[in-house]
């Protein structure tokens, strides 16, 4: 959980000096296994925040690291294991959305192609060097990246299916917060929900 000084300026509702910004992950059950939308901070981030995360963001966001809040521990509390998570769909590769990737080593990781390219660029600016933390995802063995393009959907121009996932889970490009930022649309019981990441 991020608790930045600034309260309501950051989260829109806090009454005190500190804001409250949870690093949310979403778990979806499918016939192909569990699908995790973003991961939040991971076990290693909690154990060793330095050097995994930049001092700039650790201080600015006043991060409260709690092992019980990691996606892995919450999934285990539901009676599942890391191996049950077959897919991770990322809205983007910022440290607070991708930190738990390595907690699920057997999962296929889905992300927009432009996002992966931006995260791996050698000459990045001040913020990019601090937001993208390769140590969080450099051991991923199964990446699936997606170029812009696809089908129209509810006013969006280029929504697309994801390899190995049912058509009830879609990637929706939403560039802006990062070059390859995306939303993830999920259909459940005839209704669509859009996880807009940080858009």
Identify the function of each model-found stretch.
Residues 33-35, 87, 191-195:
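Structural motif
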Residues 39-42, 93, 115, 176-178, ...:
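Active-site metal-binding loops of divalent metal-dependent hydrolases
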Residues 1-64, 139, 149-150:
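Zn-dependent metallo-beta-lactamase
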Residues 50-111:
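Active-site metal-binding motif and surrounding structural segment of the metallo-beta-lactamase
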Residues 28-31, 164-167, 186-189:
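Active-site beta-strand termini and strand-to-loop segments that position acidic
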Residues 61-80, 84, 113-173:
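Metallo-beta-lactamase
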Residues 43, 58-73, 183-199:
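Cap/insert and terminal regions of metallo-dependent hydrolase folds
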Residues 1, 36-38, 169-174, 194-197:
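Active-site-proximal beta-strand elements of phosphoester/diester hydrolases
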